[in-house]
Amino acid sequence: MESYYLWFKSAHLISAICWMAGLLYLPRIYVYHTKAKIGSELDSTLQVMELKLLRFIMNPAMISTFIFGLINAHIYGFVALDTWFQFKMFAVLILVIFHGLLARWRKDFAKGKNVHSKKFYRIVNEIPAICMVIAVIMVIVKPFD
C-alpha cells in the first residue's frame, strides 16, 4: 500500500481542489442569484447551475477527499494526536458545515425563499478561503510539531 501513497496523496489533493473550487464558486453564484427575479429565466438557469455544481462536483469531490484522506492517514500513520492535524481537522469541519449551509441555501433559492443579501454571500465566501489557508499551513509547515 505504501507504494501507492503518492497516488492516493495526489487523488486527495485533486479532490480537495475540486471541492474548494465549488465552495468558492457557489456563493458567487448566489450573489448573482440575489439579483434575479423569482420565476425568471435567470432564476431558473441559476437554480440548474447551483444544483449541478453541488450534486455533480462538490458532493463527489467532498466524499473522495475524505476517502483518499483516510487512506493516506492509514498509510502515513495515524496522527490524530498531533496538534497540527487537529487544527487541520477543525478547518475541514468548518468546510463541511459550510458545505451543508450552501446546500440549504440552494434549497431556499429553489423555493423562492432566500433571505440573505448579496453582501452576506460575498462575506461568507471568505470562509472556505480562510479554512483552506489554515489546512495547507498545518499540513505543509506543521507549526506545532
Swiss-Prot record:
Enzyme class: oxidoreductase
BP GO annotations: protoporphyrinogen IX biosynthetic process
Transmembrane intervals: 6-26, 61-81, 83-103, 123-143
Keyword entries, A-Z: Cell membrane, Heme, Iron, Membrane, Metal-binding, Oxidoreductase, Transmembrane, Transmembrane helix
Catalyzed reactions: protoporphyrinogen IX + 3 A = protoporphyrin IX + 3 AH2
InterPro entries on file: HemJ-like
Pathway annotation from the record: Porphyrin-containing compound metabolism; protoporphyrin-IX biosynthesis; protoporphyrin-IX from protoporphyrinogen-IX: step 1/1
Statement: the UniProt record of this protein carries the keyword Endoplasmic reticulum: no
Binding site for heme: H12, K88
A Pfam family hit: UPF0093
Subcellular location: Cell membrane
Highest rank taxon of the organism: Bacteria
Record's GO cellular component terms: plasma membrane
Enzyme nomenclature, EC number: 1.3.99.-
HAMAP family xref list: HemJ
Assembly information from the UniProt record: Homodimer.
PANTHER family: PROTOPORPHYRINOGEN IX OXIDASE, UPF0093 MEMBRANE PROTEIN SLR1790
Function: Catalyzes the oxidation of protoporphyrinogen IX to protoporphyrin IX. Is involved in the biosynthesis of tetrapyrrole molecules like heme. Does not use oxygen or artificial electron acceptors such as menadione or benzoquinone.
Name listed for the protein in its UniProt record: Protoporphyrinogen IX oxidase
Organism: Rickettsia prowazekii (strain Madrid E)
